[in-house]
Amino acid sequence: DLFIGDTLALVNATARMTLSEIPEAVREVDLELLRPYAVRHESGVHFYTWFFAPERNLPEYIDLGRLEAVLRALREGYRFVLVDTPLTLYVPDLELLTLMDEVIIVAVPWDLLSLRATKALALGMSRWKVTPKLLFNRVQADADLTPEFIANQLGLEVWDIIPNDGRTVVQSVNLGDPVVISRPESEVAKAIRRAARRLAGLPTEEPKRRKFLFFG
């Protein structure tokens, strides 16, 4: 998490230490150094955040050299490293995306203002020769602007779609209980798992659960 730890809030957790607190004098960043900064979730996911909540540690400039060193170390210890970046339209800030293997724009296809913001972001990425994947969130079947229309306007392809279910997701966020755990059979959870499997290079169709028969 390169911002203020929103990803931790989604799982009702807080960080004791943040990556921004690594002393500047430290030149060699390895996994052993980073382990104390991890917040371990019961799902097995490890969270690292660059800053605390705003009242404790306001976000500042992220040194790309330090970020690259951190990512290099994390790649050595984890099969997948997912980086959540703050929303920004400043082209210089987008340079950090050049450090990523893949980039995903999460867009909400609701109105023309959202389309304008997404287009500006995609254009900014193109300055750094970054071609993002387009993931649509909170998609409504009866929306005026379809994901296909927006993708066409952006010159990108629809990578995946997550349906709109405000009640389920808002409750999940407020409780800090991930929807894929609390409501695994919901359409939102299924879509999130599908996107995760696609990102991991796995078949998007989930393996069928084995049925066990008991005879008494």
Regions picked out by a protein language model, each given a short descriptive name:
Residues R27, L123-R127, T131-P132, F136, ...:
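Acidic-aromatic/histidine active-site loop/patch
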Residues N12-M17, L123-M125, I150-Q153, G176-V180:
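Short, hinge-like loop/turn segments at secondary-structure boundaries
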Residues S20-R27, P54-Y61, W110-L112:
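Flexible beta-alpha connector loops of hexameric P-loop NTPases
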Residues G44, A53-P54, R167-T168:
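Active-site/binding-pocket entry motifs
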Residues H41, T49-N57, L64:
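A structural preference for long, well-packed, hydrophobic secondary-structure segments
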Residues R66-A69, A73-E76, F80-D160, N164, ...:
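Conserved catalytic-core segment of NTP-binding enzymes
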Residues D1-F47:
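Phosphate-binding loop that captures ATP/GTP phosphates
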Residues L19, S172-I192:
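C-terminal boundary of histidine-terminating zinc-finger modules
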